[in-house]
Regions:
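Short beta-strand element of Class I
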Residues: 114-117
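Conserved SAM-binding loop of SAM-dependent methyltransferases across substrates and taxa
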Residues: 93-110
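A short SAM/SAH-binding and catalytic strip from SAM-dependent methyltransferases
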Residues: 162-174
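Conserved class I S-adenosyl-L-methionine
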Residues: 83-92
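Class I SAM-dependent methyltransferase Rossmann-like catalytic core
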Residues: 40-77
Length: 174
């Protein structure tokens, strides 16, 4: 099976499931050193193998960064039960948004997501981010902005939500 086929079989996925699927679909010569060829994680990803390599090499680190930031929020149940828009700058494969959704789910919070705005210049990466996020929320709640940061317009990120979460976990890439 392919990564996308394996992903389609998942129900209620978690980041760890995505990493496992990536590892299982990665060519064996890339499994032991998945970071090789990714320029320390800042390379714009160009193909399926690079997407899977990145997930294996850096997925857990992304979770640790996001969880550390979210743990600093007092009373997350009060904050994250409100209508929220997520703007994921340099989203790559959507890992920051996924980590947030995993985090609130682990707390037993059902987030009221108005929309998730995914901003990413790499076409394969933003398409994979969309594929990932569709497993978490409705496709109509996802807005893809395939641009570099300097090209993002106010209309691209406009929202009526009172709570807007900006994730900059991969901002160096864009």
């Amino acid at each position: 099976m392919s990564y996308s086929q394996d992903l389609s079989q998942l129900h209620n996925p978690r980041l760890e499931d995505l990493i496992r699927i990536a590892y299982n679909n990665l060519p064996s010569d890339k499994r032991t050193h998945p970071w090789i060829g990714l320029s320390h994680g800042v390379k714009l990803l160009e193909n399926n193998n690079e997407l899977m390599q990145y997930l294996c090499a850096y997925g857990k680190m992304h979770k640790e960064k996001i969880v550390s930031a979210l743990d600093a929020i007092r009373e997350p149940r009060n904050s994250f039960s409100k209508k929220v828009t997520i703007i994921d700058w340099g989203c790559g494969q959507g890992l920051a948004s996924i980590c947030f959704l995993d985090y609130v789910r682990e707390l037993g919070i059902v987030p009221n997501i108005e929309k998730v705005v995914l901003i990413e210049p790499s076409v394969p990466a933003i398409n994979r981010a969309n594929e990932h996020l569709c497993k978490y929320i409705g496709e109509d709640q996802i807005l893809l902005v395939n641009k570099y940061i300097n090209d993002v317009a106010n209309d691209d990120i406009a929202t009526n939500s009172n709570l807007v979460l900006h994730f900059f976990s991969n901002i160096l890439d864009i």
